[in-house]
Amino acid sequence: MQEEQIFHGVVLSSAPSRDFDKRLSVLTKEQGKITVWASGAKKPGSPLMAATRNFVFGSFSVTKGRAGYNLRSVKVTEYFEEIALDLVNACYGSYLLELADAIAQENLEAEEMVNLVYLSLRAILNTKLPNELVRRVYELRMLLLNGEYTELPPFEASESCCYAWQYVLAAPLAKLYTFTLTEEVLAEFSKNVALLLREAFPYHFRSLDILKAL
């Protein structure tokens, strides 16, 4: 009998598998990104149904399988159900998960990345912070975690933009979303982050397509 292991993290994606099962991509603090198979999670009344949705944070009890891990139970700490109540917030939130799914690696500890996803989703729900600012701060910090960053903006930038850039790279996670920028500086900041991101991860993100169409 396989020994159960407990991983702490967040569901990045959830897809149907066969009639009643789900295939999850879970970002964990202990093992980075893992594939988890949730047998019977789509059956009505299954205790795994709600716990295997995108955005769910918790402790995942699993056993090792042939192609990933098999889910036994989940102790949920946060569902982030409020994100789905607003379409724009839902798109930005989905993008955060998509980007993490693209960047995260297997068999590498990812505690800071898990915490970054959590705090960034919280920031999206903060009506005082523009979603575009949250997105760009998140992207730059993700680039830092992956080693794909520059100490200063790649384009010529204002002093305010440079200061914000260095702050995002150096600030403790808990202090990451404690500032705002003027529209002009945010546009400048966004342009520079977008350039770096395209070079490092030239991927296509479905959530951004939906966001553009709104």
Show which residues each predicted segment covers:
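Non-catalytic alpha-helical scaffolds and adjoining flexible linkers that form interface surfaces
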Residues: 1-22, 27-214
